Amino acid sequence: MRRRVVVTGVGLISPLGVGTRANWDALCEGRSGIATITRFDAAQFSARIAGEVKDFDPLQFIDKKDVKKMDVFIQFAIAASQFAMDEARLTITPDLSPRAGVFIASGIGGFATIEREHKALIEGGPRRISPFFIPAAIINLAAGQVSIRFGAKGPNSATCTACSASAHAIGDSAELIRRGAADVMIAGGSESAITPMGVGGFAAMRALSTRNEEPEKASRPFDRDRDGFVMGEGAGVLILEELEFARRRGASIYAELVGYGMSADAFHITAPSEDGDGAVRVMNAALANAGVEPADIDYINAHGTSTPYNDKLETLAIKKCFGDHAGRVAISSTKSMTGHLLGAAGGLEAGITVLAITHGVIPPTINLDNPDPECDLDYVPHRKREKPVTCALSNSFGFGGTNAALLFKRYDE
């Protein structure tokens, strides 16, 4: 019998707030977290807006002596993991420790640290480089620091698959539990790349929105006037547990993770395939893995980046995958409010998808003022929708054509 995997905790940090409740309330209100960049002087950049995390104090989660040893993306990962662990009411005991693992992803890692230390090198030579530079910046140290924090000695890894990274981390974690390698996984992703090089690099690709005078309206998935994505930052972490383990300890269960799909476009380094093939196959793979029919899906948290190509091709892929049901399923892009968290997007959006099941509420797609004729499905525009959600899909598509889909279901004994 296949071991079942359930979600017992959700930890979220995004431009909408620090903590799961703050994020959920903002999502339900249809509030934008996008504003003018404050972290550096972006006056010379074509894109001068982003979704920065506000009011985050690392000292609430991390000892002062350790903060300087970590890039902000690691700090976000620790804080989101703490929120998730607290919600799960989980303590990793010495007996549990070898069976508890961590899988935290990032698309870019410690960009701010890399830029700072490069400046130190140029200005002062190699002796100015911090001894904490490497462990503060490399991607797997988010998982490493979280495992140290909670004493998790089981499987420990990190994915770096662009915007699909944390969805892969969550799906791979579920597979580890299913095959008996772990009973508990702390899984998700974290990102903090709103830096001169980060913004400048994406802007050079002409991937970013330049609606600088109306930041809160810049991220507008599926809208005719969309002009690129808006960078965001933060973290999304889930606590995954084997069902019987969770039941024995009396855990509250948010939802069950029943399906996981992976695919590649094998088409282009940044653009999705023109026929939506990779997206179709990844959704079909998640449905098949779950043993669920397309008509069973009540909600899709779309990748929905607000770029000209992604949104129309994701729409096409949903139509191909879901057939007649495509027009009946509720779809929303919460990136309209959070911006694009890059490697952390899948973790944040998996958490949002789980909360939609838990609360029976579908967050809206804001700024959908003039729907693109090629994007003609139900994107839950402007306002939340109260609706029972039994099965929901979360899509994540990344540069290099790497795709992931997670399928969650309301827990039923």
Report residues per predicted region.
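ACP-dependent fatty acid/polyketide chain-elongation machinery
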Residues: 1-66, 244-256, 351-365, 409-413
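Condensing-enzyme catalytic core mediating Claisen C-C bond formation in acyl metabolism
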Residues: 4-8, 35, 213-290, 299, ...
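Conserved beta-ketoacyl condensing-enzyme motif
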Residues: 7, 23, 28-162, 190-199, ...
